[in-house]
């Protein structure tokens, strides 16, 4: 069915400045154990070269999820331009039971039609499992590709795709009047733009659940402060600027509250603000340091880092009262957790034997799986569908962003060319 593509991010582009030095995915290890799939280069119906490699975008998205292993283009048994041209036997002979084909057609008004078809080459050979078409302007061709990826991914896995999401992160550039920048890009590093520039450090961006705002820490006043910035117009609301430390903001899933850490009474403790009234209440107390809150789906419970037992570990607490419960037991220390949107697992920074990596813990069984193999890994953030994690790690004298699938199959880097990159935060569905 033909439909016009709705541009979800148009309001951002009105005021944001697009950058040339972008972060882009560089593959570290592949997905040989993922489900084989064929993604054919989309047929271009215009003059010259196609303005965007839509088929390449779809293949990369499916690969990045860790759940698929797209066949290399050099090994494609054929390059059909339509569903009718797919020869199922040629694909099934290679163990491939689904193929994505597509078409890109220029329109007289300067726009483009992008269409795809997902074709069964296994159980019901030749059957079109999913198809769609979109009319977009040139700058939204990548978005059209991500849209096709989302639909193919959901059809084949039953999981909502997260390829049209974005990431926020902080870049410390190499000098200049404003060396600290809060940036946002597509999840794969493309279409990057600046949200805020500062002469002083910026830290810990966090998305509102509707994707319209970012909370973050700034030191522009001479001390730490928590602010919330509206992306559409740049308006900034100061949330907290108490003596000592103000940090680690986290919006509740229902959007009504903001959790954060303050040290105004000495030790770091967790607080929750009702965003409508501005009222703040303290959640933890005592001499231990409690920080890095992340919400459970019910918007009533927090996972957080505490040194209550000596070394940092992850605990759970209800914001309405009750004693914190420790939920991490493997490794010498665990911290900076991010709970999945379904509440079934969390990712965290786990240290053991002198190594600091990103790990995944099943919250029902307590089972832990180490996902990363990079150096000094920090600040993991989950995609809204729980299939991928973005995090930062040390590389040489700087820091870079890394992507790993939550099954550990796929690992990649998103290196920046103009500074150190830290504090990644994955957006909700947009």
UniProtKB/Swiss-Prot annotation:
Signal peptide stretch: 1-21
GO terms (BP aspect): cell division; protein import
This protein's UniProt keywords: Cell cycle, Cell division, Periplasm, Signal
Pfam families (UniProt xref): PD40 (PF07676), TolB_N (PF04052)
SUPFAM superfamilies linked: TolB, N-terminal domain, Tricorn protease N-terminal domain
Main location per the UniProt record: periplasm
InterPro entries according to UniProt: 6-blade_b-propeller_TolB-like, PD40, Tol-Pal_TolB, TolB_N
Compartment(s) of residence: Periplasm
GO cellular component, one term: periplasmic space
Gene3D superfamilies membership: TolB, C-terminal domain, TolB, N-terminal domain
NCBIfam families: propeller_TolB
Family, as annotated: Belongs to the TolB family.
PANTHER family according to UniProt: PROTEIN TOLB, PROTEIN TOLB HOMOLOG
Quaternary structure note: The Tol-Pal system is composed of five core proteins: the inner membrane proteins TolA, TolQ and TolR, the periplasmic protein TolB and the outer membrane protein Pal. They form a network linking the inner and outer membranes and the peptidoglycan layer.
Known function: Part of the Tol-Pal system, which plays a role in outer membrane invagination during cell division and is important for maintaining outer membrane integrity. TolB occupies a key intermediary position in the Tol-Pal system because it communicates directly with both membrane-embedded components, Pal in the outer membrane and TolA in the inner membrane.
Name of the protein: Tol-Pal system protein TolB
Origin organism lineage: Bacteria, Pseudomonadati, Pseudomonadota, Gammaproteobacteria, Enterobacterales
Annotated gene: tolB
């Amino acid at each position: 069915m033909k439909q016009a593509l709705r541009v979800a991010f148009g309001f951002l582009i009105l005021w944001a400045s697009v950058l040339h030095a972008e972060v882009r995915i560089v593959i570290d290890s592949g997905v040989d154990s993922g489900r084989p799939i064929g993604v054919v280069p989309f047929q271009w119906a215009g003059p010259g070269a196609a303005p965007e490699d839509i088929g390449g975008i779809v293949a990369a998205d499916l690969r990045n999820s860790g759940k698929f292993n797209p066949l290399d283009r050099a090994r494609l048994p054929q390059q059909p331009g339509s569903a009718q041209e797919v020869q199922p036997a040629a694909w099934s002979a290679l163990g491939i039971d689904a193929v994505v084909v597509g078409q890109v057609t220029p329109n007289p008004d300067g726009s483009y039609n992008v269409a795809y078809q997902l074709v069964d080459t296994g159980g019901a050979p030749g059957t079109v499992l999913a198809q769609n078409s979109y009319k977009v302007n040139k700058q939204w061709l990548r978005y059209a590709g991500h849209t096709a990826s989302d639909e193919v991914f959901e059809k084949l896995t039953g999981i909502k795709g997260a390829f049209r999401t974005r990431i926020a992160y902080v870049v410390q550039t190499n000098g200049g009047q404003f060396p600290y920048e809060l940036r946002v890009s597509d999840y794969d590093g493309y279409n990057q733009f600046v949200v805020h520039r500062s002469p002083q450090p910026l830290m810990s961006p966090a998305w509102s659940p509707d994707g319209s705002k970012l909370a973050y820490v700034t030191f522009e006043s001479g001390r730490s402060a928590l602010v919330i910035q509206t992306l559409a117009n740049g308006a900034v609301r100061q949330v907290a600027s108490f003596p000592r430390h103000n940090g680690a903001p986290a919006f509740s899933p229902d959007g009504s509250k903001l959790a954060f850490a303050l040290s105004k009474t000495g030790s770091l403790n967790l607080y929750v603000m009702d965003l409508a009234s501005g009222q703040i209440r303290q959640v933890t107390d005592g001499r231990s340091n409690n920080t890095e809150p992340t919400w459970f789906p019910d918007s009533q419970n927090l996972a957080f880092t505490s040194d209550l037992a000596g070394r940092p570990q992850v605990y759970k607490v209800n914001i309405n009262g009750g004693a914190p419960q420790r939920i991490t037991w493997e490794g010498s220390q665990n911290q900076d957790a991010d709970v999945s949107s379904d509440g079934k697992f969390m990712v965290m920074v786990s240290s053991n034997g002198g190594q600091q990596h990103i790990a995944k813990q099943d919250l029902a069984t307590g089972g832990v799986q180490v996902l990363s193999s990079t150096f000094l890994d920090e600040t993991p953030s989950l995609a809204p569908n729980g299939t991928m994690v973005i995090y930062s790690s040390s590389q040489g004298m700087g820091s870079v962003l890394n992507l790993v699938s939550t099954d550990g199959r796929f690992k990649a880097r998103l290196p920046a060319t103009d500074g150190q990159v830290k504090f990644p935060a994955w957006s909700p569905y947009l």
